[in-house]
Every structure is written in structure tokens, then in C-alpha cells.
Amino acid sequence: MVAIFKDELHEQLGTWPLGYIPYGGADYGEIEAIARAVGDGGDTVFHDTWTAAADRMMIDGQQAEAKGHLTSARESFLRAACFYGKSFHPLFGKPVDPRVRAGSQKQIAAFERGLALSEPAIARQYIQFEGSSLLAYVIPAQGRADEVRPLLIFNNGYDGTITDLFFASAVAASRRGYHSLIFDGPGQGTSLVEHGLTLRPDWETVIGAVVDFAQTLSNVDPLKIALCGWSLGGYLAPRAASGEHRLAACVADPALSSVADGFRAYVMKLGATRDEAANLGAMPAALMERLAQIVANDRKLTWSVVKRGYWVNGAATLREYLASVERYTMDGRIAEIQCPTLFTLAENDMLAGGTQNFFDALRCPKTLIRFGSNQGAGEHCEMRNRSLVNRRVLDWMDEVLV
């Protein structure tokens, strides 16, 4: 693929909205213009450029609303939310950069201003969870808001925000007649930025609270509630399904049976024995130091492991982080998944290395859908062709949730 941004991390983070083009999150020309403006600039320039574009969209929305052009206003506000959400990703880390908190707040404000102009208007919800509350929105089926319909719960991964879920999945589901629930779980979005809730492996406890909430909704068929996870959500969703048996279906895009296994293979290439790699948090100091130097000398690894990983997992050191990821495993739980389950596998997705073995171990009704580069869908989460994966997943849902 031809890069749009000059910096590799900016390319990784700044091209996600390409997947949202069919759903109103962006247009190619806007992203290309932002990339040109960022040029050789650093993370501050990246942040400021995305923020300026979002600010312009907010002005467009306000002017359209003042003139009574409510559809244009809604579209502008929602697009602004997407762009605010992209602005602060390179700035992840702890202590929380004030620009991350401000960007998150602007994102939610723009998102809610757009949702308020929906038909019917959509308001924020809160899901009670262990003494705290998780931000959520219920996106109704298009033109069928009051009908009792199946509900799809969309689940983020490491660094996605609630607007990513909206544009990547919920809009498509709404068009196909499904109600959707999008939320910020522990370690995600506002739960992390505003409340400091970190990620946890026992995701069945989180989804249990989400399903409790979903079953209070008068327009939801309580027997047709499904869970769809993408990116790290490809671990979280199957993990939840292994313990929350009220789910009628589960989707993992891609499916992960272990977060640590990817690191395990890497440290063995660095010279670790199989026994040493079996417990990442207990690796010898010399090996840990070598790995730390590799991470420190790689900008993308520094962001994904130190800035994002430490913060999301509540870790202060590489050893603490690696010890924490060991807990994200499906060992002993795969046979507990009972509902029909769909796994995706994109050919160039590095996170999908164990998807086939995970799929083979399932004992529930199961489907595996492969995506290739010849479809423009061979990368992580099929971000260059989200409309294709949405068609395939929703077709499968149509058949499973009959």
C-alpha cells in the first residue's frame, strides 16, 4: 500500500478513518489534506492538524444548524467527533497529556451534538459496573427504533474510541436493521482517560454488566443479544462469551486466544529458551533489558508498548506490562464458548497468527471467514475495506439470529 503520512506511526493511526468513508466518518481528500499538512511534523503537529480540521467541521455544523440544515449539521458534528478522536492518539501515556483529555472531551461533545440531531435523538447512557459507570450509547435500527429487534454489542480493543465503534460497525448494523450498543469498557476511551479504569482480562464480568443493561431496553429481544469485538476485542469478546452465556452469538475480528504468545515468539528469537519465554514477567534481567532497548529504539514499539500498553494495563515497567499480558489467555476456557461464533482472519494481520488454531479448538457452532489483500481487506481489522467485513458479518448474523 502507498503511504499517505510520512511517519510510520502517523500512517498507522491516521489512516483508520479510511475505513469510515462509507459510513460518514471521513472522505479520502480530507485525510490526504491532513497528511500533507502534517508532512514531516511530529506528534504535536499531527494533533494540531487533526484538531484544526475538526474545529472547522464544528463551525460548518453550527452554521448549518443555524440555517435549519439539520442533516448537514449532524453529519458535520459526527465527522468532527471522528477527527477529534484521531488527534490525540500519538499522545497516549501516563501521566495523561492534557491534550488527550481535552481531545476526548471535544470528541464526545461533538458526537453527542450529532447524535442529538438523529431521528430519533440518541442520548448518552451509563452502565453501572463495580461502583463506577461506563459511557454507552444505543444506536437504533434505521427506521425501526421502536421495534423489538436483535442487539449487537460492539467491543473495542486497546486504543479504539467509542466513535471508532460507531463508524466502523454501528452505522452498518443500523442500516441492516440491528440495534447496536457501543460503550467504553475498562481501559478504553473515557473509562481510561477520565476515570483511570484499566484493562482487565476477565471480560465476562464487564459484558455481564453490559448484558444486564441491554436486557432493560424495551426494544431489544433479550434472546438475540450478540457481541462483536475487534482488534484486542478479538480476545475480549470470546473471553466474555466463555463466561456470559446469555450471548446469542460472538464475533472476533481477529480472534486471539493469547495476548502474550506474540511476545513469546519474539523473545525466543532474541535468544530466550522456551522455559524462559513461558512466563514473560519472570524473564532474566539481561533478556528483559535487551527487549527494553529494542522497544526504546523503535518509535512504533515505544508507542504501542510503553505509551499505550503501560497506560492501558496499569503497568509502570516492562516487566509489569509483560506479566499483565500473561493473564489475557483463553487457556482452559475455549470449551466454555457455547454460542455460534464467527472468527475473521485477514492474511497480513500479525495479530491473527493464532486464529486458525483457536478456531480449530472451538466446540461451538463456528465459522471462519478469510480476507485477502486482493480484496483490499488483508490488513488488521480489514480497515481498507470495512464495508466488506460488515457485509460478511451481518450476513452471518442474519442467518444466526433468525
Residue spans for each PLM region:
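N-terminal cap/lid segment of alpha/beta-hydrolase-fold proteins
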Residues: 50, 54-57, 100-145
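Short beta-strand/loop motif that positions the catalytic acidic residue
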Residues: 337, 343-345
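Alpha/beta-hydrolase fold nucleophile elbow
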Residues: 219-231
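Alpha/beta-hydrolase active-site loop
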Residues: 197-219
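Catalytic active-site module of serine/aspartate enzymes centered on a nucleophile-bearing elbow/loop
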Residues: 372, 379-402
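Short beta-strand element of the alpha/beta-hydrolase
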Residues: 147-157
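Hydrolase active-site cap/lid region
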Residues: 242-323, 345
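Catalytic histidine neighborhood in serine/cysteine hydrolases
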Residues: 362-378
